[in-house]
A protein has these predicted regions:
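Short, well-structured N-terminal submotif of metal-dependent ribonuclease cores
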Residues: 1-44, 53-65, 90-96, 130-133, ...
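Active-site neighborhoods of divalent-metal-dependent phosphate/nucleic-acid chemistry enzymes
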Residues: 73-131, 154
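Non-catalytic, well-ordered alpha-helical scaffold segments
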Residues: 29, 46, 102-106
Length: 161
C-alpha cells in the first residue's frame, strides 16, 4: 500500500515548542515519530527552512535537529509553484500579506502530495480557503489537495480513532 505523503508546514513544527499547550506538543511530536518510523512520508520545503532560520537561535537549532532526525525530504519552490501561489492570492483564497501560506500550499500541490498538515486555521485549515484553493487547482489543471490539522493524522482528537 502506498504511504501517504504529507507536507508539514512550519506551524506544526513550531508546535513542538508550545509551552502553553502540552497537547499540541504531544501531537507534533507524535506526527514526527510517525514520519520518522516510516508510517508516512514527510515533506517540508526550502520555504519552511527559511522560516525556521528566522526563529530564535535556541529553537532554530532544536527544530533543525528534529527535522533531520525525522527524515523529512525537502521540496524546492519553482516558477510553477510561485505561479500557483499567485493564483491563490488573486482568487482571494489567501491574503497578499500571507503569501507564504499560499506558497506552502502550492509547493505541496505541484509535488502532488496527499495532504498539507497545518495548525494555521485562519489561512489554511479552513473550509472556505480549501474550496478556493481546490477550485483554483482544478481550473489550473492540478489535483485537489486536502489541508488538514495534525490531529487528523495522529488521531489525537477528543474522540478515540
Amino acid at each position: 500500500m502506498k504511504k501517504l505523503r504529507l507536507y508539514v508546514d512550519t506551524s506544526v513544527l513550531g508546535g513542538i515548542f508550545d509551552s502553553e499547550e502540552p497537547k499540541r506538543v504531544n501531537t507534533a511530536e507524535r506526527l514526527l515519530r510517525l514520519i520518522g518510523d516510516g508510517t508516512y512520508e514527510g515533506y517540508i520545503s526550502r520555504l519552511t527552512i527559511e522560516e525556521i532560520l528566522a526563529a530564535p537561535g535556541k529553537i532554530q537549532k532544536k527544530l533543525q535537529a528534529k527535522i533531520t532526525n525525522s527524515g523529512f525530504s525537502v521540496l524546492e519552490e519553482n516558477a510553477e509553484s510561485v505561479n500557483l501561489a499567485d493564483a491563490y492570492v488573486n482568487a482571494g483564497a489567501i491574503p497578499e500579506k500571507y503569501r507564504a501560506d499560499a506558497r506552502h500550499i502550492a509547493i505541496g500541490v505541484i509535488h502532488d502530495l496527499d495532504y498539507i498538515v497545518s495548525w494555521n486555521y485562519k489561512h489554511m485549515v479552513n473550509i472556505s480557503v480549501r474550496r478556493l484553493i481546490n477550485s483554483t487547482n482544478i481550473r489550473m489543471g492540478y489535483n485537489s489537495i486536502e489541508i488538514i490539522s495534525p490531529e487528523e493524522v495522529t488521531g489525537d482528537g477528543e474522540v478515540e480513532i
